[in-house]
């Protein structure tokens, strides 16, 4: 999943903003961005489907298609016009929760500041490298 997002600084800490949702980056990513003297900027944010989690708040999306794959559900959703693939574990979900993840359902998702990837929008270079 690749998103148009913003790299911002709050109290000298780097964070990414996606769909109005702000996630502070991990200490390792903080150090790499500081070492590279990276400024606030528009970025391409990379997120693997298995690193996205459903949440009560976060980035809003609507499920287009769901695929039950045994112990996971693969969700194909739309977040502000952008296609998103999310892989959700069903291990700790009730049948009711699993059944609620159907086409047309409204969801919110988030991600950890340690698992996202920050790329320059202009050069496509990983800003953490």
Put a short name on every predicted segment.
Residues 2, 6-129:
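Non-catalytic connector elements of ABC transporters
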